[in-house]
């Protein structure tokens, strides 16, 4: 007799994705981050909806509405802090998830990978819009600096900047549209996520050995669902500990001041999870070149399926590529650190060196793997 989870049209879809999904028996903890990203997205949407009920998207009262949420709304302080630190957790999981896919060459599943990179852009856009909403000093100047980069586009630049701003400066129309886009994008991300999962379940998951696992798969539940629950408990515990013990650790002190167009902060910088891209932007002396490098810092991930033709699936079989990969991870960490430093020597030359090294990885890595395959033959 068929159970309801196998017969009901809607429940059957969920069942085939979460319960009876055939999963490789040997996938490790590194495969947990997909479900953790889903959890982060749900957490952000739930906390965001409650914040939107009390937030006012008007430059005269936006900052005060945040103060109102923190002081007067029942548990508003907790909701806001979980939402702010949840974004950091989201990006930690996102970067670990991306790093794992690069290491194990999961980008060979081209449709899934392409959709994943598009989702990364959408999440980055959502986070940037959200950073502007408190209308503190760093919110205002961050929005001014980043949106002003559009002016580097030939011919259309100035028109695009004024179109995004809704005027001749970052002002009320800018805040209103940023709030609207910040509210809508997560729902677009949910749609993209479903497409991402659809593509993934067409081919099945990769595994640490990089071998075809069709002969040796088990249902996702109960083993992997309980395994994912361990990850959920760990990251949610970490999020709560951070939010309750040191809630503003990852924020910027400048944002405790209301936005003032007449006073420029000493060091304008985005949130920590964008600092690697910001360091790449700053390392190019030319404005247009910097914008191109900024976009390429993430969009270069699109070329990985085209440039990397490994005979074996995954860096675990390529010792020199493993070294290259961990050097690349260290480059990203160092770029993040450089992005938070002032624009002065020796940080300028260090940023330029690290930027060159960052992009060289995507050129050298396929060449080294080709040489290794050639030697094995």
From Swiss-Prot:
Per the entry, what this protein does is:
Component of the ubiquinol-cytochrome c reductase complex (complex III or cytochrome b-c1 complex) that is part of the mitochondrial respiratory chain. The b-c1 complex mediates electron transfer from ubiquinol to cytochrome c. Contributes to the generation of a proton gradient across the mitochondrial membrane that is then used for ATP synthesis.
Q: What's in the keyword line of the UniProt record?
A: Electron transport, Heme, Iron, Membrane, Metal-binding, Mitochondrion, Mitochondrion inner membrane, Respiratory chain, Transmembrane, Transmembrane helix, Transport, Ubiquinone
Q: Provide the binding site for heme b b566.
A: 97, 196
Q: In which residues is a ubiquinone bound? A: 201
How cofactor binds (record note)? Binds 2 heme b groups non-covalently.
Q: What else does UniProt say about it? A: Heme 1 (or BL or b562) is low-potential and absorbs at about 562 nm, and heme 2 (or BH or b566) is high-potential and absorbs at about 566 nm.
Q: What is its main location?
A: mitochondrion
How does this protein sit in the membrane?
A: Multi-pass membrane protein
Q: Which InterPro entries match?
A: Cyt_b/b6_C, Cyt_b/b6_C_sf, Cyt_b/b6_N, Cytb/b6-like_sf, Cytochrome_b, Cytochrome_b_C_euk/bac, Cytochrome_b_N_euk/bac, Di-haem_cyt_TM
Q: Which family does it belong to?
A: Belongs to the cytochrome b family.
Which CDD domains does the record associate with it?
Answer: cytochrome_b_C (cd00290), Cytochrome_b_N (cd00284)
Residues engaged in binding heme b b562: 83, 182
One GO BP annotation of this record? mitochondrial electron transport, ubiquinol to cytochrome c
Assembly and binders = The main subunits of complex b-c1 are: cytochrome b, cytochrome c1 and the Rieske protein.
Tagged with keyword Metal-binding? yes
Which cofactors does the annotated protein need, by name? heme b
Q: Where in the cell is the protein located?
A: Mitochondrion inner membrane
Please indicate if the UniProt record lists Electron transport as a keyword: yes
Q: Which Pfam families match?
A: Cytochrom_B_C, Cytochrome_B
What name does this protein carry? Answer: Cytochrome b
Q: Name one GO cellular component term.
A: mitochondrial inner membrane
Taxonomic lineage: Eukaryota, Metazoa, Ecdysozoa, Arthropoda, Hexapoda
Q: MF terms per GO, please?
A: metal ion binding; ubiquinol-cytochrome-c reductase activity
Which residue ranges does UniProt annotate as crossing the membrane? 33-53, 77-98, 113-133, 178-198, 226-246, 288-308, 320-340, 347-367
